[in-house]
Amino acid sequence: MGAGRSDPPGARDAAGPRWVVAGRDVYAVDAVVDADVVVVGAGVAGLTTALELGGAADVLVVTKVGLPSGSTAWAQGGVAVAMAPGDSPEEHAADTVDAAAGTADEALVDILTREGPRRVRELIARGARFDRGPDGSLRFGREAAHGRARILHAAGDATGAEIGRALAEAVRRAPRIDVWEHAFVCDLVRAEGGGVCGAVVRRPDGTLAWLRAPAVVLATGGIGRLYAATTNPPEVTGDGLAMAARAGALLADLEFVQFHPTALAAPDADPLPLISEAVRGEGAHLVDGAGERFMVRVHPLAELAPRDVVARAIAERLAVGERVFLDARAAVGTAFPERFPTIFGLCMAHGIDPRVDPIPVTPAAHYHMGGIAVDARGRASL
């Protein structure tokens, strides 16, 4: 989103605090701060954008929590990328299109799968430590809807935390990137010509600032906290989507919300702890209250069917009063603490030992597939 540095309506004539029209409101700002690019959000998308631009522009990253922020650090499962011997971007793309059930933009899927290996190599160069085998080669696991093992993990089930750590450290080292933590972006500011020329931000001390910039990047994550059952952290409340809508941006596919099939069914937990798909990739089975597998009757890939298929099958059973469990005793067993240390700790905190107990699971809101409509270069309608 961008328009140049022209002032918004009303800003130039203000005496004392400057009056700025943003979204559907008028704000009295205490300061005007200039940057070449403002990036709203400090998860993997926001931090990567800042690093890509930071060598050639003055970038200001704003996050309402700390660095890194959002769902990135909570992501257990890994990165799907066609880098394993015998794999290819074309095969990865075919699996992706199949899982999308006719809804994917195949041109964008092609970009995603072709650029994936290069982006992973960039993460490694920036310090991300992915799991490797005894010979030092990258270790790939298998997860749902993938025809082969192509998922990279870090520390077993702490992939997002490791990627976030590496990117945050790189951002802090970058001389032309500034970060405002614990600052809340209220609204986008539009110039008289109609484009976006910055954002109004509430700083930690409560004062308001107009971040004036010719380009604003929204990397604010999803809407998971709109749902009672979600795996998302508290800050994922759809702020970026809402401010884009107030500014008049085109939105798309808002109805597509992915529910992860296997969150820990812990009524006292908020958010619900995620039981990564990687556990099923290791061979764990979904079973009903009688200990019988049911996904083998639902889909040829059984537990590794696309997430919507698995989540729907579980939800149907829960709706009629049944319980569903993820049984990893045979597939992982005593190796659980080493293979999935984060999940093991979460389960134990709720009185479940996955080495000897089946894990009660339930679907939970996980990922917003829709959002602000953009083109192949990430440009919105504003």
Give names to the regions the model predicted.
Residues 37-61:
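N-terminal Rossmann-like FAD-binding beta1-loop-alpha1 element of flavoenzymes
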Residues 1-37, 55-56:
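Extreme N-terminal leader/targeting segments of oxidoreductases
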Residues 243, 249-360:
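An anion/pyrophosphate-binding glycine-rich loop and adjacent beta-alpha core
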Residues 54-76, 85:
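Glycine-rich FAD pyrophosphate-binding loop
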Residues 104-117, 151-169, 180, 230-238, ...:
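Short beta-strand to alpha-helix junction loop
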